[in-house]
Amino acid sequence: MILVDTSVWLDHLHAAEGRLVALLGDDEVGSHPLVLDELALGSLKDRDVVLSSLGSLRSFPTITHDELLALVDGHRLWGRGLSAVDAHLLGSVALVAGGVLWTRDKRLMAAAADIGIASMA
């Protein structure tokens, strides 16, 4: 399953991303509550439809505060310009066997690659 980050969704909502459309059709895409939260805070065309559609995708698990701190320490994620949301997404994907993260954020992509969960979708 692929967790699609907010950066990819925003680009897709402005101009259809063919690869994402195909992955959605193959039921390979999952979501995360914090990605939905970030999108909900933005200005979206057809906001209710978009949020409802993304909310209906399979959801990646969330991690606890203690799990987040263990991830940050275990993978030395501090000082890399990541946000708390970024760290939560990394931890959530790491919990899913075969899970990968698709992002356009360079720092988040580098951290995902270091952990072994980066998607080149």
Task: Label each region the model flagged.
Residues 12, 18, 59-121:
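Active-site neighborhoods of divalent-metal-dependent phosphate/nucleic-acid chemistry enzymes
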